[in-house]
């Protein structure tokens, strides 16, 4: 038994203070030297994670407290990264359930907690952000108990210990009105409540690979908890898949464990510890890394299937190559293969067309994160409209992914939200008061109706509403939905947009370009107010005359162009359209740029 090791995961809804809590736990436990400069948001290592305030990739860290090593695994808090969550929980012996003292139990809390309880973890409940003026700790504790009951928690799990805390201020206490001095009571409770796993150090080495990182120096680095035996540098090892088939064999060239957030090389890792090993180039997530004499794989949690796919190809617009550095199909393919290897929530396949690739993931955010990362790396590409991945039941009926949507809005907006969800085939499950003139509405709705809905929701609630979505499961196909009602305003030729032309076209619809923006034939430069595409000239300047009034030629006022994210633009696409992505620009376009070719294609009915 590894009595001096505790492996815990932190479960929390997005922005409930998880990463900040970990920051302060590490600082107060002495994980850093007194003179060491420490960044905020230590566990958010990616640029996008720090920008968006969400955890995308799970990552371990460790704290030494009272002669015990506490390995902390920060789990993603968003539904699209469920694949990460499931694997991370397999490394944990216990969990901290962090809940905002004002917002209370939220969808992501329910989603990850359900998986943790199913694996038999016994959480410590931490009511966080108690320094909020609108905190309602007692009500939130009651809601939490009700949530445990609804998730079929057993008696031991229902008898959870509770701490009241402020991660930002750096204190935790067993009582609401405790002394509020530091986080030491929480660290003590972790050691007391979380029981170390009973593991046998005498058996041959075996470890489930739960995370994978690409390292330019070490090659493939695999992270996992040693389930039995000890791992020693330079020992022969192999990887076997879930069927027990050998997929790789080699030597354990390097072994590391975490001290704080840093990897430190060690000679021996023992059962119960979370380590990083290198030496196998073909091993993957969910494989068992083990001694040569081990033949039984460690069971791995099934991973939820992807629900959405996009097609990515080389940038074929007339502006291709003017803004990016990575342009070829080979570069795109290699990048996507690497992503699929490192992120089991993403799957990769190649279309019949050699230069076209299909990427499937767990939702809009996962796909948007990938496209944003590639954009920052200098890629140019063309992306198709997202497609929902359907399944069939035993009778051959079509099933589609259904999401649970929880919204918190002012009462005056609730009818608008109900109406907008009805149009998306949403069904209202619950409506309740959450405070003065505040409502919480819960819906079930098909994923395909929710693409780009967040921006629409914020418009309907004038920026005051909060929306959360979670994958519920597959349900019966809810029937066809209306697509975009606005026709596209399409550029008739290549050139640069002119202010005079845009000014005169503004009355015909919303424009996506401004003065001097490059445009090309087939590029969507705006949306018409009614159905039906319209080809327009945005390069037409004012005719010169002999008699010119001084100061009037340039006196045009252009409506500012709406700034839209990748997800918003993808949600706008019809089946015959695409999105051009470059490091500097996002451009909507027709899949076939030439209008004559488009008409031929429409008549022939050839799929794009």
Locations of the language-model features?
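Structural and coupling elements of P-loop NTPases
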Residues: 1-608
């Amino acid at each position: 038994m590894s009595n001096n090791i505790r492996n815990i995961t932190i479960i929390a809804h997005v922005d409930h203070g998880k990463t900040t809590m970990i920051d302060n736990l590490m600082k107060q436990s002495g994980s850093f030297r007194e003179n060491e400069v420490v960044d905020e948001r230590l566990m958010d290592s990616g640029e996008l994670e720090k920008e968006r305030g969400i955890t995308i990739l799970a990552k371990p860290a460790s704290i030494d407290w009272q002669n015990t090593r506490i390995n902390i695994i920060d789990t993603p808090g968003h539904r699209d990264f469920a694949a990460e969550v499931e694997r991370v929980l397999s490394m944990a012996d216990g969990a901290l359930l962090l809940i905002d003292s004002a917002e209370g139990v939220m969808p992501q809390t329910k989603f990850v907690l359900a998986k943790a309880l199913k694996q038999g973890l016994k959480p410590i409940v931490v009511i966080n952000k108690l320094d909020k003026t609108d905190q309602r700790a007692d009500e939130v504790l009651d809601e939490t108990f009700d949530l445990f009951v609804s998730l079929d928690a057993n008696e031991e799990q229902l008898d959870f210990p509770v701490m009241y805390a402020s991660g930002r201020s750096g204190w935790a206490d067993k009582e609401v009105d405790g002394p509020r001095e530091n986080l030491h009571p929480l660290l003590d409770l972790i050691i007391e409540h979380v029981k170390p796993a009973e593991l046998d150090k005498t058996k041959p080495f075996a470890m489930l690979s739960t995370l994978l990182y690409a390292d330019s120096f070490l090659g493939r680095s695999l992270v996992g908890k040693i389930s039995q035996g000890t791992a020693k540098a330079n020992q022969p090892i192999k990887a076997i898949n879930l069927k027990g088939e050998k997929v790789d064999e080699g030597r354990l060239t390097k072994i590391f464990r975490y001290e704080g957030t840093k990897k430190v090389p060690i000679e021996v890792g023992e059962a119960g510890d979370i380590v990083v090993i290198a030496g196998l180039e073909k091993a993957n997530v969910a494989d068992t890394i083990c001694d040569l004499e081990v033949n039984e794989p460690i069971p791995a949690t099934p991973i939820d299937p992807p629900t959405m796919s996009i097609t990515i190809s080389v940038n074929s617009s007339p502006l291709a190559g003017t803004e990016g550095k990575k342009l070829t199909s080979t570069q795109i393919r290699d990048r996507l293969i690497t992503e699929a290897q490192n992120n089991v929530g993403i799957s990769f396949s190649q279309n019949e067309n050699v230069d076209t690739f299909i990427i499937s993931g767990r939702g809009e955010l996962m796909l948007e994160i990938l496209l944003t990362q590639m954009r920052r790396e200098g890629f140019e590409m063309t992306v198709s409209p997202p497609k929902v991945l359907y399944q069939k039941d035993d009778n051959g009926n079509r099933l589609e992914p259904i999401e649970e949507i929880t919204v918190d809005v002012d009462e005056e907006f609730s009818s608008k939200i109900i109406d907008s969800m009805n149009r998306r085939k949403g069904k209202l499950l619950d409506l309740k008061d959450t405070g003065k003139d505040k409502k919480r509405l819960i819906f079930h709705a098909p994923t395909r109706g929710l693409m780009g809905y967040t921006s629409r929701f914020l418009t309907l609630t004038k920026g005051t509403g909060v929306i959360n979505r979670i994958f519920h499961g597959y349900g019966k196909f809810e029937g066809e939905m209306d697509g975009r009602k606005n026709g596209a305003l399409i550029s008739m030729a290549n050139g640069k947009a002119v202010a005079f032309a845009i000014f005169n076209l503004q009355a015909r619809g919303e424009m996506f370009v401004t003065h001097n923006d490059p445009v090309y034939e087939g590029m969507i430069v705006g949306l018409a107010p009614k159905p039906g595409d319209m080809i327009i000239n945005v390069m037409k300047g004012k005719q010169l005359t002999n008699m010119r009034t001084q100061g009037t030629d340039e006196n045009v006022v252009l409506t500012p162009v709406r700034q839209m994210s990748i997800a918003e633009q993808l949600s706008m696409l019809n089946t015959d359209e695409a999105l051009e992505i470059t490091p500097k620009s996002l451009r909507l376009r027709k899949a076939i740029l030439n209008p004559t070719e488009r008409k031929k294609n429409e008549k022939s009915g050839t799929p794009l």
